[in-house]
């Protein structure tokens, strides 16, 4: 949907991000004389998730740098898949946000520089919740809440992920925003908070990383709740939306 919404540049961001991740892993295995691991698909997933978390207007060198950092410094240098102590895609995004902050937070779309729905909420402005839910509000490439929900539910049904982490993440985040977000438990406000700012992507696709998340049901519920709480804290107290 992000490619449909944002066009060729968004497609190139995704393509470069995935290709850079795969190439970085291939070259590392070649130089280190390790068995080739690109066929497991994890590099593709890392590149795709990183690309979907980026602004559709980022310069094309940014997804390349982010994917290479994620694969080499977060995954390969720690022993490869199953040994990384952080989510590669999420860590790559954090690295890019620190290194290229202005480009990462620029949503200059259709010739107009627009605030994201979450930035508008923090400023006390009205938000088009329907546009945010469907993915037509200024956001990252993978910012359609509807598409993220469909993908997340599909993964839960097919066993790709378990429901405990997303459920506890969203429940705790929603409760925190209701208590401390400044608008009480207004359903429209809470719905807008859930649909924006990467909450659904984090709940379904980042926090559920099988390598860096707990394996027991209780651990998953606790982990999801803690991440949801931290997301609420960052949303309320953080300077960046």
Label each region the model flagged.
Residues 22-35, 71-82, 150-160, 204-213:
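C-terminal ends of transmembrane helices
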Residues 82-149:
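Long hydrophobic alpha-helical segments that form multi-pass transmembrane helix bundles
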Residues 29-39, 57-58, 133-142, 157-164, ...:
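Short, amphipathic, aromatic/basic-enriched membrane-interface segments that mark the entry/exit
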